[in-house]
Amino acid sequence: MHQSEFDPHSKEVVARAPLDPHLKALENEAIHIFREVAGEFDNPVMLYSIGKDSSVLLHLARKAFYPGRVPFPLLHIDTGWKFKEMIAFRDEMAKRYDLDLVVHTNPRGKTEGVTPFSHGSALYTDIMKTEALRQALDAGKYDAAFGGARRDEEASRAKERIYSFRTPDHKWDPRNQRPELWNVYNGMIRRGESVRAFPLSNWTEVDIWRYIQAENIPLVPLYFAEKRPFIERDGMMILAEDERLELLPGEKVQHGSIRFRTLGCFPLTGALRSEARTLDDVIAELEIATVSERQGRAIDRDQSGSMEKKKREGYF
């Protein structure tokens, strides 16, 4: 048996082997959430960070509204410090799928010269990501924002609802969230409030990768192992391909087979040594992994309880 599905690289309908029941159930839930939010809210937007979860989210959004266009814009908060491969991939996807892409950079951060090196990861993230996101959401007057967060990623995300309610200044109070009964979501909001909606809440990292494999979803190549230059700093392997990266005393550029489990700003994202060059290799590697994928993100450990503090202030 085969089912008719659209080719992720075009709008053509092709024969594709059916998903296994577990992935199909997750897909159905995510598509239901997309359609519920699109039907309930006046002005939704999808937060697009270009990583593997965003790629799956985009694929599901296209499925949810196929054969029409994705009926809401994609919002990318560009800090100016993303991997160059990410920006090239973002622009390619927007062109390929005829997406309404909104890109925002915090003008205050640009004027003040805020960088991960000059201001440290905590202040840099607050200005260039959290503050920038609040600016963009206010400018677009969006009342709902889709995000690709999953409950298995990190402790504070584990307690977040699928509909995560935010105050008029985009803050999150985990003690003041509404109950969710099965797949019944309450989208009623007060004036000025908004919702972050998370269609991938119940997916695991391995689910994401198996779905990418089953659906042939394109990804940024940094997720796959390749011989690359890097330096070791603060317990992380930092990619050394950007001329803005200045070596500290005692540091030297090394070369080795590395890849990334998660993608963010290059100075704050650590690689891992790996030989996983294919989807099968990546999945096999993850099935025996003993640490979280976000162990390689400096912003998750720059202060005690850092992710929850960031989310309370309006972070993704």
Swiss-Prot record:
EC number per UniProt: 2.7.7.4
Keyword Glycoprotein: no
GO molecular function: ATP binding; sulfate adenylyltransferase (ATP) activity
Assembly behavior: Heterodimer composed of CysD, the smaller subunit, and CysN.
Function: With CysN forms the ATP sulfurylase (ATPS) that catalyzes the adenylation of sulfate producing adenosine 5'-phosphosulfate (APS) and diphosphate, the first enzymatic step in sulfur assimilation pathway. APS synthesis involves the formation of a high-energy phosphoric-sulfuric acid anhydride bond driven by GTP hydrolysis by CysN coupled to ATP hydrolysis by CysD.
Family recorded in the similarity comment: Belongs to the PAPS reductase family. CysD subfamily.
Protein name listed in UniProt: Sulfate adenylyltransferase subunit 2
Organism: Allorhizobium ampelinum (strain ATCC BAA-846 / DSM 112012 / S4) (Agrobacterium vitis (strain S4))
